[in-house]
Design a protein with these regions (language model features):
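Extracellular glycan-recognition/adhesion modules and their associated mucin-like linkers
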Residues: 1-22, 40-69, 85-116, 134-165, ...
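A detector of tandem-repeat and repeat-rich interaction/domain scaffolds
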Residues: 29-30, 232
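Extracellular interaction modules
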Residues: 33-38, 81-85, 126-133, 177-181, ...
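A short beta-strand-loop micro-motif that forms or neighbors metal/cofactor-
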Residues: 72, 215, 262
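Low-complexity, intrinsically disordered Gly/Pro/Thr-rich segments
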Residues: 122, 263-267
């Protein structure tokens, strides 16, 4: 199962079960991220593009009370019973965020009145395209894990050329050869972000100087804790992820959909293309 923070694109707060309640009927709120399991949600496919969304702490699922069709109904957690009022669809907002729509009501999760405070109860409301209805799904893991990172467009993997150890070496795509220079450790740094370290060099993926510009080429660099070395994983909805810089809000991108070995990876504004999507395949 995949576990995520569900963060409002409007308020920056995350879905939260108040106090980690285990009760049926506990209302779900937005709250500042604090790392608790009551803010972690497991998305489990149930059918035809729908998911149940289960709290890691309570093992209860997001639920529209009584399957109501009304605007303004507050969302609760409840024991999984297989009802369509507990099934949710992820609809792309086109910016890396999603609308989360109930199968039963066709309403979406909504932060009432564009509120930004802690403790605001989440409601369902008819779709209107507002940012208070958009949610970022940020992959979370408790422990570091090692992956090869495969471009959806080219099938090539992220690679440190010849396993070089120096700072400033630019990261390329290359045919998978199983080398440690193609293995990447995703190490949680908090708030759903990771540093991404080469197994070969022990350097991390880095946006040079924290640049905000499109087309800046990605390098490896000694870990210094900067936000230009922190990355979040945003699901593309097909088992792949967009890998977004905390500093620039740009994503890893294969320039021009290039398919060849040796192409240097850049950052670019999100556009949803397969050249910005990456599959993470665990390696030993």
């Amino acid at each position: 199962m995949d576990t995520y923070l569900v963060r409002s694109a409007w308020s920056g707060k995350v879905l939260d079960v108040p106090g980690g309640s285990l009760d049926n009927g506990a209302l779900v709120q937005q709250f500042q991220y604090n790392g608790g399991t009551n803010q972690h949600w497991e998305f489990t496919p149930v059918s035809m593009g729908f998911y149940k969304i289960e709290s890691e702490s309570s093992q209860k699922v997001l639920d529209v009370p009584g399957g109501s069709l009304d605007n303004g109904v507050q969302i609760q957690q409840f024991m999984d019973n297989g009802g369509t009022n507990q099934h949710w669809q992820l609809l792309s907002a086109g910016n890396g965020s999603f609308y989360i729509a109930s199968e039963s009501s066709q309403k979406v999760l909504d932060v009432p009145g564009f509120a930004t405070g802690d403790g605001v109860i989440i409601q369902q409301f008819q779709f209107n395209g507002g940012r208070n209805q958009q949610w970022q799904l940020i992959h979370v893991a408790d422990d570091a894990q090692t992956y090869k990172v495969i471009s959806v467009s080219s099938g090539k993997v992220l690679d440190v050329p010849a396993g070089q150890l120096g700072d400033g070496v630019q990261i390329q795509q290359f045919t998978d050869n199983g080398g440690t220079n193609q293995k990447w450790e995703f190490i949680p740094v908090g708030n759903g972000f990771y540093k991404i370290a080469s197994e070969a060099s022990e350097k991390v993926l880095d946006v040079p100087g924290g640049s905000l510009d499109n087309g800046v080429q990605i390098q490896q660099f000694t870990d210094n804790g900067g936000t230009n070395q922190h990355w979040q994983l945003l699901p593309a909805g097909n088992g792949a992820f967009y890998i977004m810089s905390e500093a620039s809000q740009k994503v890893l991108d294969v320039p021009g959909f290039a398919a060849g070995d040796g192409v240097i990876i850049q950052q670019f504004q999100f556009n949803g293309g397969p050249n910005q999507q990456w599959r993470l395949v665990p390696v030993g």
